[in-house]
């Protein structure tokens, strides 16, 4: 068994993400029989000594039938209406299922704002920690009724990876309608199964497709979530929901993704993955090389353009001349100040403007 699988099987703190397709039927509504089997697997892992946080999709799918809808809506207002109905059904179903074991369920609805704003981040962390300490099962979902772009977040794959970092999880398990990672689409022809991903080199040639009828998360979102979790030092198991008992038990199914050897610091993880970008700086070739290759601080001399309105302390994107995103960082100056500093060497600037635009400690290559 690989080191990643051993880490997943022995993890004391686990986040389990369950996709829409694993919880809802094509006819609409929740499939409570399948949900009960998933709750059984989670309960078994908890009785084995692990803390488990469940990230559950399915709110929109659960709201379709009660509203007389036959298919997943495309417009935002109807999605949010379906989510508002489905959240009640989803929370009730999880509560009923875990009540068989005397477990209490707490519903936690999060949005991207809760990760990008430090105060929200801390509050969510404290809530989840307290629920676990009280022996309750935290069931997390995205707050679809107020989300905009986030409603297309990738069927909660990215949310699950962020939650894994938030609670300091030792493993992330993604359960959906796929058995793991393939180098092509197994539904369309021959494809080779990939049991282990040790580094990005193992992903060469992998084709990432879109999700199923009821979900929004295809393989692309799962790969993105696995990379995000790896940055946080969390190994990931991607497996079929039908194999939940084995996935949460021995971990001998699906595809295992190894965590990066050296995890990003909490601050750099936040800069790279969680914080909202408030603007962008366009860099010349020398500055791109300095920040992306040599990990140097960004100086005003290497900036050719400022985009957006932002303040000192905000996170901004760093772009090459061809608009390619090369890094993100916490900027020291307001956008109005920076506009007067473009292309000027440090010695040409007033004493109050001789700090780096972004210090190397606040820069993260992407």
UniProtKB/Swiss-Prot annotation:
Predominant cellular place of this UniProt entry's protein: cytoplasm
Keyword Metal-binding: no
SMART domains the UniProt entry points to: PUA
Protein location: Cytoplasm
Tagged with keyword Kinase: yes
Binding-site residues for substrate, renumbered to this chain: 57, 144, 156
Pathway involvement of the protein, from the record: Amino-acid biosynthesis; L-proline biosynthesis; L-glutamate 5-semialdehyde from L-glutamate: step 1/2
Residues that bind ATP: 17, 176-177, 216-222
Purpose of the protein: Catalyzes the transfer of a phosphate group to glutamate to form L-glutamate 5-phosphate.
HAMAP family in alphabetical order: ProB
Name of the molecule in the record: Glutamate 5-kinase
Higher taxonomy: Bacteria, Bacillati, Actinomycetota, Actinomycetes, Mycobacteriales
């Amino acid at each position: 068994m690989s080191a990643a699988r051993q880490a997943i099987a022995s993890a004391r703190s686990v986040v389990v993400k369950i996709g829409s397709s694993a919880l809802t039927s094509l006819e609409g509504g929740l499939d409570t029989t399948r949900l009960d089997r998933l709750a059984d697997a989670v309960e078994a892992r908890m009785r084995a000594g692990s803390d488990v946080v469940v990230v559950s999709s399915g709110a929109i799918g659960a709201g379709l039938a009660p509203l007389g809808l036959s298919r997943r809506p495309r417009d935002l207002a109807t999605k949010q209406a379906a989510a508002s109905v489905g959240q009640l059904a989803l929370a009730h179903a999880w509560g009923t299922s875990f009540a068989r074991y005397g477990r209490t369920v707490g519903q936690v609805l999060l949005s991207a704002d809760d990760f990008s704003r430090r105060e929200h981040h801390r509050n969510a962390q404290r809530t989840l920690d307290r629920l676990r300490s009280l022996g309750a099962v935290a069931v997390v979902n995205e707050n679809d009724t107020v989300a905009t772009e986030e409603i297309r977040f990738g069927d909660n794959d990215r949310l699950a990876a962020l939650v894994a970092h938030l609670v300091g999880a030792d493993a992330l398990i993604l359960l959906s309608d796929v058995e793991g990672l393939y180098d092509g689409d197994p539904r369309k022809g021959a494809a080779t199964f990939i049991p282990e991903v040790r580094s990005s080199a193992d992903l060469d040639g992998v084709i990432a497709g879109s999700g199923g009828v009821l979900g929004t998360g295809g393989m692309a979102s799962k790969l993105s979530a696995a990379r995000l979790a790896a940055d946080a030092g969390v190994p990931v198991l991607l497996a079929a929901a039908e194999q939940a008992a084995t996935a949460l038990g021995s971990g001998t199914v699906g595809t295992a993704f190894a965590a990066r050897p050296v995890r990003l610091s909490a601050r750099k993880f936040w800069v790279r993955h969680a914080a909202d970008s408030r603007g962008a700086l366009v860099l010349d070739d020398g500055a791109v090389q300095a920040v992306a290759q040599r990990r140097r601080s960004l100086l005003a001399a290497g900036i050719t353009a400022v985009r957006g309105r932002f303040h000192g302390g905000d996170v901004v994107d760093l772009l090459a001349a061809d608009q390619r995103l090369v890094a993100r960082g916490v900027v020291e100056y307001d956008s109005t100040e920076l506009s007067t500093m473009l292309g000027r060497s440090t010695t040409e600037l007033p004493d109050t403007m001789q700090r780096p635009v972004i210090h190397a400690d606040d820069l993260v290559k992407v």
